[in-house]
Amino acid sequence: MSDSAIHALAGSVGGSAAMALTYPLVNLSTRAAVQTKKEELTTREAVAKVIKSEGVLGLYSGLTSSLFGIAVTNGVYYAFYEEMRSLLIRRRGNTPTSSTSALTTTEGILAGLIAGSITTLTTNPIWTVQTAQATHATTARNASGAIETDVEGNAKKVKPSAITVVKEILEKDGLKGFWRGIGPALILVLNPVIQYTTFERLVSLLLGFRLAKQGATPTGKTALGRSSLSDWDLFFLGALSKLVATSGTYPYIVVKSRLQAATHKYKSSIKAVLHILEAEGVNGLYAGLGLKLLQSVLTAAFMFVAQRRIYEFVKKLIVLSAERKKLVSKV
């Protein structure tokens, strides 16, 4: 198994684990992004509203498609990002291992743009379905077709299944409907670019600082590699880099979410921005920002740690498997 494939597997599993841990925040932040200023709710009110109308499980609506989406997204992204990273490092004349020094800013941006663009074009249909699941609700009916109500007599709401959403998109917009919001989604390629470029720079600064404390310079054989970073290093660097990325690109996240949810009749990304500014002001482009920052920062922090641990675990399994084969061949 190639190093890039191991990174892809680790990113896929690590991202899924992080998503599962923080999914209620993912769900709430998506809903907050598509609500208008008139509908704006506090986090506590949003949680209470979901539980009242959909039950506790409403906080996990769309979880299955999200886990599938993040697994595919991270797998594709890490595969291409690591391939680009290895290629760029080989151009320096170095060996592309996990302990190789960090990418330069230009290299990080290039690797991120290529990996992010490929990933976005490939996985946009998955996120269109997930967003629709998380933001749409239909009236619950029993076996006889009668409307189900709660203790207060209000109609119960249920979330549509992924299959139901797929059918609705096909009936309404055809195949092109799965690429709703692709414009802002491609612009949002900048999010992981900023995230990973910031992460690489923070790694470089941290390792350089530690070398300076040892009285060495970060060049040649004395350079520390990324393998010297602790889990806490990865957690905080991952969180900080995601904070920077999400803060800078959030208005596009709002526009993309609204286009994918199809809860607002916007004909294009530009018209969506103009309509939001006219109806809700600048604050409309930052609807749900607090929740999104909390969710994305925690998800990224957990993901960076999980990805590294899974990567190391798989590498050890491969080494052990190779050693066993050698022993068997000698017998």
Positions of predicted regions on the chain:
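Matrix-facing interhelical linker segments
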Residues: M1-V331
